[in-house]
């Protein structure tokens, strides 16, 4: 049995199982044996690497991802999957080295520290941005007393206290939260109060409860940053109050895309709380804004004695014109869907259809001892 026939047999086995079990490794032996006979197809190498990862054979998966890069050094797919693999294993230094290779090859990304799965070329890449880059920063900082007063009033109504974690807020990781709790290191606590998010039914304003609690804050945000409000409404970003307890660490991670930037307005900023974006550290100051690109590797640590609270605003990258927001978003969603599809779709030939029809609902069997040159 030659390499192509073995691969087709493996695909047929896989397709018969994958709908019932998306994490199936059916057909793995046939895929491996096919690639041993003919390792020249990078698409086959890519799929085999993914299947080996699901099988828990991580060292072999890594080896095949590296072979994909060697076979297609100007394609970003292998670099991206290897970087995600290394990051999931906590091997961030190695992930940066692979990203550096990708940048030098012109395959994907512009900086080894900036590794989002969806990367739009042509946008300025830098971890930190200056306040002077955003004229609206002064207006937001000018509203700091009113914003903080409304937050403290909320604390009073709900029995929370200014120096402690607001227990009435949603814990990040909860199904009602806007962000992923996986990055909170064990023992930490991260809570949020959503001002604008995809959970709101209105397309242009906050929900009635939020408007009642934060009338001045919402009026300012809707007049000053309508694009950021719209971004939050469609689920690409969010505008929230973000609280991190003392002793909490948010582990290093990269956001999914470089189409947005992040603003933090400091509301409660203890000494010892800090954020690293790329290789550089930053801190917060009450009443002041900081700006960074969260598609860069970043982490947050609160070694202070009290809670750290900021007003967090995601907004479109300033070099992305408004008329391109939706088309860029749609392209990014298509790119992300294609990435997911590559992981579950082995390259197939017409021979696979023949095998599936022949199977008539019965598993396609490939014997482990079958010689490669059998008919």
For each feature predicted by the language model, list its residue ranges:
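Fe(II)/2-oxoglutarate oxygenase catalytic core
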Residues: 50, 54-56, 70-240, 244-259, ...
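A short hydrophobic beta-strand segment most commonly corresponding to one strand
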Residues: 261-266, 289-291, 306-322
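A short beta-strand-loop-beta hairpin characteristic of the jelly-roll/cupin
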Residues: 267-286
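Canonical positions in the second alpha-helix
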Residues: 33-34, 67-68, 102
